[in-house]
């Protein structure tokens, strides 16, 4: 499968390593190759602030689990859905969503309530990564990236770190999924 479906030795070796680390079946491997995981994860030009906000080696581990772009081809018309409809579709397809994120993710909840002061806020999707020992907040936007979205995500990360994270957990990671981005604005 690897020899037939991969373009070069480096890609072949990367998928081999992923199979060993994640225990992928041949079906999962075939899906990951077809979705271009190598190009989206290993070679992607990712827009994150992990290197400036997180200590090594945690920043490198957090960077490794990110992809650009995420592929939600298992959801019909994903690009045309409103946020709540996209959220509904992702929750219905949670197994495939976890497969897209990678190994080690556990689903904690949708519209996860978190109390900050006297107010209650709702995180679109909350996960826990058992390999990285950290919470993983997903904020969904069905429009182009706007700077205020990063502020809201940062607020959620601080709230989760303050309310849910245990002393043995690593800092919370956030993923802001937008319809698109102006790379300069997003950075």
Residue ranges and their predicted role:
Residues 1-187:
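Basic, low-complexity intrinsically disordered segments
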């Amino acid at each position: 499968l690897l020899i037939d479906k991969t373009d070069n030795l480096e890609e072949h070796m990367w998928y081999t390593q992923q199979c060993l680390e994640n225990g992928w079946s041949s079906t999962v491997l075939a899906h990951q190759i077809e979705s271009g995981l190598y190009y989206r994860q290993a070679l992607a030009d990712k827009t994150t602030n992990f290197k400036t906000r997180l200590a090594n080696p945690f920043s490198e581990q957090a960077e490794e689990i990110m992809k650009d772009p995420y592929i939600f081809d298992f959801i019909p018309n994903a690009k045309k859905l409103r946020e709540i409809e996209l959220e509904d579709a992702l929750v219905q397809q949670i197994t495939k969503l976890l497969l897209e994120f990678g190994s080690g993710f556990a689903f904690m909840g949708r519209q996860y309530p978190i109390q900050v002061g006297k107010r209650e806020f709702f995180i679109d999707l909350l996960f826990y990564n058992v390999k990285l020992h950290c919470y993983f907040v997903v904020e969904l936007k069905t429009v182009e990236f706007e700077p205020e979205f990063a502020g809201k995500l940062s607020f959620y990360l601080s709230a989760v770190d303050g309310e849910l994270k245990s002393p043995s957990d690593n800092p919370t990671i956030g993923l802001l999924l937008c319809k698109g981005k102006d790379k300069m604005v997003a950075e």
